[in-house]
């Protein structure tokens, strides 16, 4: 039976944590959202793209996955963020549109943000996330997977929930070369740690409230009325006021993280299959609890966590 302390791969829910790292650097005066990213990654061959555009998926850049699939010679060797940047330099794929001329959700934006965090902070992305974010709010079970650079390992990480592909029979999800790209995915965490992050947002423990609020502002003013807008690492619901969320899917895992501020509700769902609840069913859970979950609902020690956060000298804030 799974519990709140079991660790899963978050897939694209990782993006909200990458965005938080960027906001932390901005709050310290180290990063300007509207500066060209070539001022941070000077070798990057596309000008006119800002950190803000990466955060809101408005860069227009084409998918790195397509580049790697076409040109990476040995799929047993990890493809890293540095390799990704090198491939954009080498092959210069045509962007989908000019910077800030549209919205296109793409993993490349958040993979580049991880590289931005590294260049600005002087730390590796996994180290920055651990030392500056996870440790700061006692997310003790959370980490960024750092794949060995030489060859693929056969499985994921010990003590983490194994992912599965649901075909005729469940098949273990194997490690693969794109798992070395960080920022867009490949963060591991559990329900309790993720709830700590949600409370840390409420109490302004990572960035001031004025900066945190920018994460929940629509990044595309002329966005389709039929789709939910996107802020900094969060989707913004068009159906529910003051409701923000993100889905995740990647190689044997699905995830969903939602905060409903008006009703003071948080919904965190982590699964270890690539096929499980649909996006519609996620929303049904929030709206009317129409979906039955097995084995049972889990009670999170909300009061205990909130009380620990309220008092900064408690053990919760220990590094």
Where are these regions (language model features)?
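A short, well-structured edge-of-sheet supersecondary motif
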Residues: 1, 233-235, 267-268
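Short, surface-exposed loop or secondary-structure junction motifs
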Residues: 48-249
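Short, glycine/proline-biased beta-turn/loop segments that scaffold the active-site neighborhood
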Residues: 32-47, 136-137
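Short, gly/Ser/Thr-rich active-site loops of penicillin-recognizing serine hydrolases
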Residues: 228, 240, 275-319
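Active/ligand-binding-proximal structured segments within catalytic/core domains
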Residues: 18
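Short, small/polar residue-rich loop motifs at catalytic or cofactor-binding pockets
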Residues: 252-253
């Amino acid at each position: 039976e799974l519990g709140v302390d079991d660790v899963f791969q978050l897939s694209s829910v990782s993006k909200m944590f990458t965005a938080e790292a960027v906001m932390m650097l901005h709050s310290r005066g180290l990063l300007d959202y509207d500066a060209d990213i070539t001022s941070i990654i000077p070798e990057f061959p596309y000008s006119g793209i800002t950190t803000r555009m990466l955060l809101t998926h408005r860069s227009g850049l084409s998918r790195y996955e397509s580049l790697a699939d076409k040109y990476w010679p040995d799929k047993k060797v990890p493809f890293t963020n540095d390799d990704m940047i090198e491939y954009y330099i080498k092959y210069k794929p045509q962007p989908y549109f000019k910077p800030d001329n549209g919205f296109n959700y793409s993993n490349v934006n958040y993979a580049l943000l991880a590289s931005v965090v590294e260049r600005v902070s002087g730390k590796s992305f996994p180290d920055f996330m651990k030392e500056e974010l996870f440790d700061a709010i006692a997310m003790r079970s959370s980490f960024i997977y750092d794949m060995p650079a030489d060859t693929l390992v056969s499985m994921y990480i010990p003590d983490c929930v194994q992912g599965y592909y649901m075909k005729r029979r469940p098949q273990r999800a194997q490690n693969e070369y794109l798992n070395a790209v960080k920022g867009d995915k490949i963060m591991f965490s559990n329900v309790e740690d993720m709830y700590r992050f949600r409370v840390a947002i409420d109490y302004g423990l990572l960035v001031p409230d004025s900066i945190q609020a920018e994460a929940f502002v629509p990044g595309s003013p002329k966005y389709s009325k039929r789709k939910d807008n996107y802020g900094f690492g969060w989707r913004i619901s068009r159906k529910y006021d003051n409701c923000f969320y993100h889905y995740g899917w990647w190689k044997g895992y699905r995830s969903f993280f939602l905060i409903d501020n008006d009703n003071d509700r948080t919904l965190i769902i982590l699964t270890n299959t690539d096929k499980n609840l649909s996006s519609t069913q996620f929303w049904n859970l929030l709206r009317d609890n129409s979906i039955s979950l097995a084995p049972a609902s889990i009670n999170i020690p909300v009061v205990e966590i909130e009380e620990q956060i309220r008092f900064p000298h408690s053990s919760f804030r220990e590094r």
